[in-house]
Amino acid sequence: MKYVGAHVSAAGGLANAAIRAAEIEATAFALFTKNQRQWRAAPLTPEIINDFKAACEKYNFGPGQILPHDSYLINLGHPVQEALDKSREAFLDELQRCEQLGLTLLNFHPGSHLMQIDEDACLARIAESINIALAQTEGVTAVIENTAGQGSNLGFKFEHLAAIIDGVEDKTRVGVCIDTCHAFAAGYDLRSQEECEKTFAEFERIVGFKYLRGMHLNDAKSAFGSRVDRHHSLGEGNIGHDAFRFIMQDPRFDGIPMVLETVNPDIWAEEIAWLKAQQTAEQAA
């Protein structure tokens, strides 16, 4: 079973995210549980929590179909201790919000060394940041997203993801989310079925599909291997349709939320319908 949707707005209340996802006939969705560009947010009230849970139940979104994303401000590998502590506090709050909402996944960008510490030291800080937060929460898996490798962001190599996982004590509560645009921009080719086979064989060898907890389905305005993060609508960018057809027809991607972060929300419903059709076509073949 494939779960496909988009990163929808929670403006006006978290429950609205589920409603908006249902309107585009999604079977998965992503959201921010707070303003992603602010450090602090008001605590969740019982009313907000209950309304969100009721909307998810009404529209048949189980916890495994929802991939919340944390704040863009958080850097779990920050080289400066004071800033690292601030990020760790905010990340814990994000996990606790998921816990309160009955959600089981939290997607996040791993972190950046800011040219001040080496990659290994930064990856170790990220793993320790995850350990600190997991020790104070229950039931929520920390889902590390691969990055395009812009600036000093880590996570653009599968080896980075594997190193972070290796440093996490509770392996049952850590996973990864693969963003197709980020992977392509980082030098993992997805432009044909053959290239997809190679890239995901490498992913299996280095990280392992057992850790795959979500996908971001995005085409790329950015060039292959450019280390530039620029999303595009499916089939309109430099990746093309084949990668998304491959993913929809491969059972290794079953049972996880796969969400669009493509550039035109007006065609999300069409993109979701197209993705679903690829799966149906394969099953009928």
From Swiss-Prot:
What biological processes does GO assign it?
base-excision repair
- Which cofactors, if any, are listed as required? Zn(2+)
Uppermost EC category: hydrolase
GO MF annotations, alphabetized = deoxyribonuclease IV (phage-T4-induced) activity; DNA binding; DNA-(apurinic or apyrimidinic site) endonuclease activity; phosphoric diester hydrolase activity; zinc ion binding
Instruction: Check the record and name the InterPro entries matching this protein.
Output: AP_endonuc_2, AP_endonuc_F2_Zn_BS, Xyl_isomerase-like_sf, Xyl_isomerase-like_TIM-brl
UniProt keywords, alphabetically: DNA damage, DNA repair, Endonuclease, Hydrolase, Metal-binding, Nuclease, Zinc
The question of whether Transmembrane helix is a record keyword is answered with no
Q: Give binding positions for Zn(2+) 1.
A: H69, H109, E145
Indicate what this protein is called per its UniProt record. Probable endonuclease 4
The scientific name of the source species is Enterobacter sp. (strain 638)
Q: What is the lineage of its organism?
A: Bacteria, Pseudomonadati, Pseudomonadota, Gammaproteobacteria, Enterobacterales
